[in-house]
Amino acid sequence: MGQGDESERIVINVGGTRHQTYRSTLRTLPGTRLAWLAEPDAHSHFDYDPRADEFFFDRHPGVFAHILNYYRTGKLHCPADVCGPLYEEELAFWGIDETDVEPCCWMTYRQHRDAEEALDSFGGAPLDNSADDADADGPGDSGDGEDELEMTKRLALSDSPDGRPGGFWRRWQPRIWALFEDPYSSRYARYVAFASLFFILVSITTFCLETHERFNPIVNKTEIENVRNGTQVRYYREAETEAFLTYIEGVCVVWFTFEFLMRVIFCPNKVEFIKNSLNIIDFVAILPFYLEVGLSGLSSKAAKDVLGFLRVVRFVRILRIFKLTRHFVGLRVLGHTLRASTNEFLLLIIFLALGVLIFATMIYYAERIGAQPNDPSASEHTHFKNIPIGFWWAVVTMTTLGYGDMYPQTWSGMLVGALCALAGVLTIAMPVPVIVNNFGMYYSLAMAKQKLPKKKKKHIPRPPQLGSPNYCKSVVNSPHHSTQSDTCPLAQEEILEINRAGRKPLRGMSI
């Protein structure tokens, strides 16, 4: 039978657009939905119009044109004017494996999935800005029970494994948690966020002022020491921080402690809470203050040693600046950008390490050319006494800082220095655009999620019922073997899960 035979032609109406092809074309991909149309009993299993002699599918006509071309040419391309999830659903419906997408279109196809993963990573970002109208009844009031459950899942990833029974806990636990965790959940949550931001800024300001000599006057102190035959008085001078700064820091720590305890108590998932790096920073920044206050009244040598150590580790208080990431989207975007650009940073470090090693060696030997004949070390006239010293100069030069503490003094060394500076500019410039693009992508996604209106009711189409045109066949008289039984076709949702998991289903699977 030739391809030009009228009986070999088949008409497929997809969303009102008629497509004509040959049955032999549809047979090129066995086990798919279109391949079943080429079988003799297809009229009884699909929506077939005998008067128009066509099969009808209520699907996207534009995407189907690309899928049909895949049967004709063997190359699957992704349309640029179709959203990625829609194209993914269409591939699953027609039984096409996503890994068949051509390499030229793979990045376009994957873009939507990367965007979804990025949006999920901003779990603490607000989903709507209309909470002012819904929070008049109480703190963290986000609507009915479904809204509270959605808020809890969005902020805490799961329900509490140790949730307490009773209506009070079930009603107020997600509200109090949102009050301290999500500044955009309600008006009262914004008040808490402003208070937290105020104490963070005050604490950091106090930390900086404590290092100024104006607030560290020198005072004379005496200490009675026990000696072998009695006691003796020892006089010494010591810098002592102004008391009002300590009181201010104490007030800030009281607030941070209250905030931390409330978040611990009302957290739906204690394990996830403990694993969170920001929560670890909160605890580490609070603990030294209480240890210092508790040991300040002791006079033993061990207590004084511990106090001295705690004064040294006061710098951990500056880590509270990272608490601002809960309140500013831009800081969260920066954190996600740094994590997403790990490969680029590693590449930059490798390039710099190679350049530093090469140019430190070159400058060392280049400077030795101008050595005096009576100089046995050949290094009295230059700063570059050895190659390790040249590492510092190479780093400063390649990063275009140029402190000027070390510089070449011979014409050959100057030539190496010029090459080092040019190489540094080119090396740093290569990965920077990728990092900037990542920041722009994450920032736009964060802004999109922040302004995304809350969906009150999501449209979910009815699944295909047995006997409907979109329901796949229960019995397939196909000569092609299948890994599944004909009475258990692979659902469209399962195809989506397989594609997202990166597993490649066999071509013979029933769809």
From Swiss-Prot:
Annotated positions binding Zn(2+) = 77, 83, 104-105
Reactions that this protein is recorded to catalyse: K(+)(in) = K(+)(out)
Question: Topology versus the membrane, per the UniProt entry?
Answer: Multi-pass membrane protein
Q: Which GO terms describe its biological process?
A: action potential; cellular response to xenobiotic stimulus; cerebellum development; corpus callosum development; globus pallidus development; optic nerve development; positive regulation of potassium ion transmembrane transport; potassium ion transmembrane transport
**Does the keyword Cell membrane feature in the UniProt annotation?**
yes
Q: Which residues are glycosylated?
A: 220, 229
User: Which segments sit on the Cytoplasmic face?
Assistant: 1-190, 268-276, 332-344, 437-511
Q: Which SMART domains match?
A: BTB
Cellular localization per UniProt: Cell membrane; Cell projection, Axon; Presynaptic cell membrane
Modified positions (Phosphoserine) are 44, 130, 142, 158, 160, 474
**Cellular component per GO?**
axolemma; axon terminus; calyx of Held; cell surface; dendrite membrane; neuronal cell body membrane; plasma membrane; postsynaptic membrane
Instruction: Give a GO molecular function annotation for the protein.
Output: voltage-gated monoatomic ion channel activity involved in regulation of presynaptic membrane potential
Q: Which SUPFAM superfamilies match?
A: POZ domain, Voltage-gated potassium channels
Q: Does the keyword Transmembrane apply?
A: yes
Residue numbers of Phosphothreonine PTMs? 483
Q: How does it assemble?
A: Homotetramer. Homomultimer. Heteromultimer with KCNG3, KCNG4 and KCNV2. Heteromultimer with KCNC2. Heterotetramer with KCNC3. Interacts with the ancillary subunits KCNE1 and KCNE2; the interaction modulates channel activity.
Record's disease association: Epilepsy, progressive myoclonic 7: A form of progressive myoclonic epilepsy, a clinically and genetically heterogeneous group of disorders defined by the combination of action and reflex myoclonus, other types of epileptic seizures, and progressive neurodegeneration and neurocognitive impairment. EPM7 is an autosomal dominant form characterized by myoclonic epilepsy apparent in the first or second decades of life. Cognitive function may decline in some patients.
Which family is annotated? Belongs to the potassium channel family. C (Shaw) (TC 1.A.1.2) subfamily. Kv3.1/KCNC1 sub-subfamily.
Name of the protein described by the UniProt record: Voltage-gated potassium channel KCNC1
What gene is this protein translated from? KCNC1
